[in-house]
Amino acid sequence: MALKHFKPVTPGLRQLVIVDRSGLYKGKPVKTLTEGKSSSGGRNNNGRITVRFRGGGHKQTYRLVDFKRAKRDVSATVERLEYDPNRTAFIALIKYEDGELAYILAPQRLAVGDKVIAGEQVDVKPGNAAPLSNLPVGTIVHNVEMKIGKGGQIARSAGSYAQIVGRDQGYVIVRLNSGEQRLIHGACYATVGAVSNPDHMNTSLGKAGRSRWLGVKPHNRGVTMNPVDHPHGGGEGRTSGGRHPVTPWGKPTKGMKTRSNKATDKFIVTSRHKRKK
């Protein structure tokens, strides 16, 4: 789908670039495949802000997307492509031969009327899901499982994908968009193709209000605050902070590594930081 630019008849339209969604279904989602969703406003169960600059935004209904593709060897037809406010990608409503409906992530080049299937042996075409070990090396995949049967976790946002680059003793080597290469068990399922809406990265919100519709509030810099609020706060007039950049909690920012070592590090074949050197 193409990008839409607008005549600058108002200041908010001057910078606005959005994805043309005219090809998507215009009605409401399937009610049995939706749930209510209450926004947290960045607060935890104690009512304290745990994520700053969140709140407001348009009310959303959660669509129950099938990341597991647990219904195996049953063909399904794509009924329609839909917008989903909870993610950057589009979703596809599929109808199995037995009449059951489900939502899946829509891959690129999936059209209404296409047939999709999940199983051990499937054709390598967009929307079909299979174990990684049964897909040929070089295949572009998305919605990749990290644990058998847990459901896809890798490559789910708009335009993202991973690529199978090799095999090793029951595991499959997968290259991610970040440049990282990981070992993933061959029995983990993945869906063929790249995720839909690749133009999402080229959009421009155009005005602050559009950010507010998404539930994002203004982000304040530390140097504009008072000393009680931030280590960079205070001073007479405008200051540069007077120290190396830190978070509101006093920890160095700008490049300090915060990731702790995990037992699963052994599955990382090539770090995403390797290519930066």
Curated annotation (Swiss-Prot):
The Gene Ontology biological process terms listed for this entry are:
cytoplasmic translation
Domain of life (superkingdom): Bacteria
Entry annotated with the keyword rRNA-binding: yes
Q: What would you give as a GO molecular function for this chain, any one?
A: transferase activity
Q: Keywords for this entry?
A: Ribonucleoprotein, Ribosomal protein, RNA-binding, rRNA-binding
Give positions of region: Disordered. 223-277
Q: Which PROSITE patterns does the protein's record reference?
A: RIBOSOMAL_L2 (PS00467)
Transmembrane feature ranges = none
Under InterPro entries, the record lists: NA-bd_OB-fold, Rib_uL2_dom2, Ribosomal_uL2, Ribosomal_uL2_bac/org-type, Ribosomal_uL2_C, Ribosomal_uL2_CS, Ribosomal_uL2_dom3, Ribosomal_uL2_RNA-bd_dom
Query: Between which residues do disulfide bridges form?
Result: none
Q: Which family does it belong to?
A: Belongs to the universal ribosomal protein uL2 family.
Q: How does it assemble?
A: Part of the 50S ribosomal subunit. Forms a bridge to the 30S subunit in the 70S ribosome.
Its annotated function is as follows: One of the primary rRNA binding proteins. Required for association of the 30S and 50S subunits to form the 70S ribosome, for tRNA binding and peptide bond formation. It has been suggested to have peptidyltransferase activity; this is somewhat controversial. Makes several contacts with the 16S rRNA in the 70S ribosome.
Name of the protein described by the UniProt record: Large ribosomal subunit protein uL2
**Provenance organism:** Azorhizobium caulinodans (strain ATCC 43989 / DSM 5975 / JCM 20966 / LMG 6465 / NBRC 14845 / NCIMB 13405 / ORS 571)
